[in-house]
Amino acid sequence: MHATGQVISFVTPFERSADAWRKGLNSHLPSSVRVHWVRRVTDDFPARFSATGRRYLYVFQEGEADPLARSRVTPTGVLDDAAMHAAGQCLVGEHDFTALRAAACQSPTPFRRVDHVMVRRYGPFVVIDVAANAFLLRMMRNIAGALVRVGRGEWRAFDLQAALVGRDRKVLGRTAAPDGLYLVDVQYPDHFLADALDRSAGWPPGRLPPMLQHRHSLDRL
């Protein structure tokens, strides 16, 4: 799994400037993780439980595995992205997502509100874009696993809807691998982090993750 919009919070007895915290944290983090900004918040702000919405992308790449995109996408055969997009619309709205949650999920309720499901193609890349108020454990990877079955012609839109209504996790089959998963945005009430989160520069729907945009550009040459 990858993240371009992760927000975390922590409690500390130490006093440092925001820039000192950012530089200090980055000096101890592995090269694959970077802190972009730091802000002081009130005591009633836990980053996880204050969030009002989250957005994930899942990226499949058709054809043979690309060594330059290794661990950043999930390789697959040819997909019908239009069929995947159409099938995904049955997930929009508030539903019982028992069929799409992992057995180890500890959420007290299986109900979640999905705001949009979009599937778009960028050359060999097929991107699934889902926004919701919250996600159950492995819910996004299970959505990707179900939609790829539609894309391969193994399922129709009706089959996904029937699985959702039937609330049977076993019907969906395999969970998609973590490689193609990206957390791209976390939403908060306006009074939290208003000066840090630039909503006008939000992630455009269905956009390809930055680390894959160069691959798409090369394919179009």
Which residues fall in each region the model found?
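Structured-RNA-binding interfaces characteristic of tRNA pseudouridine synthases
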Residues: 1-221
